[in-house]
């Protein structure tokens, strides 16, 4: 048993190293409207950390294009095939979501003027990204432990060191601080140990996963619709606007079920996305399905985090194992991606949650669904 635990710890450590070391090759082009010299500058090639954010790459990108930029104040933003990219979504998630067929390098366009404020929330560089990250971490802490005081009570020095470790991809530095927050790992037997619950009631001390309360895993889901007759992902039409993406914050509560040895990813997705799996046309979330605020509307740094109702989906769909038909909903699941991996639906969900989560302790899952053609009635 001890040897098995050692093996599992080794696998988890290797998975974390791969997640933190993952990168997307980027080829960044300067938009024609920002070019003031001839010939125009060549594109800039770089690696975008999967767990990183596009605004953090601006200093090196600007240095490359500095000789040709127009005078004035920079308002930097990125686009892909005409779609402005949300700066608070990690680079790896954007890539998994928008590139149905992986594009290497990923060709992006950078703008230094004309910020689309009607589409994107304003970003003031690193400070905005750090603020978004810390608020997401507070949200995750609230979901996992029932409050966010463990994050809010961090010293300024620890907050700064934690953020620097994320920016620099320093896993060891991150672990030195994040382990004190008691935000994981999640365990299958988390409902068994209840001895510490009574002693913690009425206390501000955060509870760690496994302390007797049901585990709640912070999850962000991105559901993208593709054309109904799509057989090859390289033929998927590009995303034209963010309204076609369902962006959902919804925690998954781990509940042990009789006869179930472990919770699969498929089971978790069916629970998280009843709108896509259930045969019911609609469903009102109960209290266990409330979600924290989205990154672009997160609470202030000096406030605690309280849950609110889940965002309503902009479209309905269903899910099942890869490429499986879904009854009564006219949808087909084409793909499920986590950290660039097309995951098997039978994989243990808690392994995915523990090992493929991002540094803010959220598990990001991209789901592609296609609308199935409906057969005409009466053979017509």
UniProtKB/Swiss-Prot annotation:
Keywords, sorted A to Z: Autophagy, Cytoplasm, Isopeptide bond, Protein transport, Transport, Ubl conjugation
Post-translational modification: Conjugated to ATG12; which is essential for autophagy.
One of the record's GO cellular component terms: autophagosome
Record gene name: ATG5
Assembly description: Conjugated to ATG12.
InterPro entries associated with the record: Atg5, ATG5_HBR, Atg5_HR, ATG5_UblA, Atg5_UblA_dom_sf, ATG5_UblB
Protein task: Required for autophagy. Conjugation to ATG12 is essential for plant nutrient recycling.
Protein family membership: Belongs to the ATG5 family.
Highest taxon above the source species: Eukaryota
A Pfam family per the record: ATG5_UblA
Skewed-composition ranges (Polar residues): 194-203
Region named Disordered: 194-214, 283-309
Cross-link (Glycyl lysine isopeptide (Lys-Gly) (interchain with G-Cter in ATG12)): 138
Keyword Cytoplasm found: yes
Protein known as: Autophagy protein 5
Localization terms from the record: Cytoplasm
Gene3D superfamilies the UniProt entry points to: 3.10.20.620, Autophagy protein Apg5, helix rich domain (1.10.246.190), Phosphatidylinositol 3-kinase Catalytic Subunit, Chain A, domain 1 (3.10.20.90)
GO biological process: aggrephagy; autophagosome assembly; cellular response to nitrogen starvation; defense response to fungus; leaf senescence; mitophagy; piecemeal microautophagy of the nucleus; protein transport
Main location: cytoplasm
